[in-house]
Amino acid sequence: MEPATGILLPLLHRLPMELTDLPYSPGALQPHLSERSVALQHGQHQRGCVDQVNARIVGTEWEDAPLERIVRESQGALFEAAAQAWNLQFQWQSLRPRGGGDPVGRLADQVKRCFGDTASLRKAFNDAALGLFGAGWAWLVLHPDGSLAVVVTRNAATPLTSHSVPLLACNLWEHAYYLDYQNDRARYLEAWWKAVNWEFAAEQMPG
């Protein structure tokens, strides 16, 4: 019997966009973020966004486009799914096991110039994050003029669509912290800073 290639090949076709792996194990950010919380965000929420992107780009002009281009150039439901998928992946890189502390080198100099010190940056970041009503993201970004700033975006909006360079991302959707901290966003932010990846942030700075 000949193989039913007309049926099998479409099922084996590689989807345009795949869920990227975590840069560490789901339990590696404990005790700041639990294994269950990380696994839920990555395995369900981020996977769901990737699935939504694939459902909308197969057979279209976007099918072979990198995720960053889709985020920058698409609109509507495709943008929302693509941007949230990108934001979530950037979030995982913004965190690391045994993270926290203070930045060093050129990034530390910029923090001192723009905020005075790391403690003042944390306060500005936390104030902005706590001031957001509903879902969204808090970011540390580098503006084209070389200054650092804290930016808050609503829902899936992202600085990737602006001229600023994102350095760090903090997920302010309630599902990001409810399992560990219920509705206490302030405690979540305190834990987030203990896992922040300053090395990754510094690597995003051009030049």
Map each language-model feature to its residues.
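N-terminal amphipathic/basic-hydrophobic helices that include classical n-h-c signal peptides
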Residues: 1-15
